[in-house]
A protein has these predicted regions:
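Catalytic phosphate/metal-binding cores of nucleic-acid and nucleotide-processing enzymes, i.e., regions
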Residues: 1-124
Length: 124
């Protein structure tokens, strides 16, 4: 039986859109202005997948999604904000999905330094 690539593509886009909405709702607890960046569906690459945060957020979902590819995509489209990729790995064995945050090391260091200044410095 031939594969219906149009249906597969639509299902994949729907899964991605659902993850973007879910992620935006999760991030609202931290950044109340967080919302799905719907601009990419009209103009392509103009807004992050989740907007209203201090980061350019790229959201990816699938079975073993490409984390480096997600970061590369974010960095190519970013507007100067630090980039993060929030990657949801759907398991094929119906186990709970893994969610990862991928960022450059310098972004991580900036985040830790900002946090440490909020709590009185790092104890090393």
């Amino acid at each position: 039986m031939p594969r219906d690539y149009a249906k597969i593509g639509k299902r994949s886009r729907t899964k991605g859109s659902n993850w973007e909405r879910t992620l935006a709702n999760i991030l609202k607890a931290i950044w109340p202005e967080a919302k799905r960046g719907i601009g990419q569906s009209r103009w392509g690459g103009e807004v992050p997948d989740v907007d209203g945060t201090p980061y350019w957020v790229e959201a990816k979902v699938g079975v073993q999604p490409n984390m480096r590819g997600a970061m590369r995509q974010a960095e190519e489209a970013a507007d100067g904000r630090p980039c993060i990729a929030v990657v949801k790995d759907n398991s094929v064995n119906n186990t709970p999905a893994d969610v990862w945050v991928v960022m450059r090391f310098d972004t991580f260091v900036q985040l830790v330094l900002a946090e440490s200044s909020d709590i009185g410095g790092l104890d090393t």
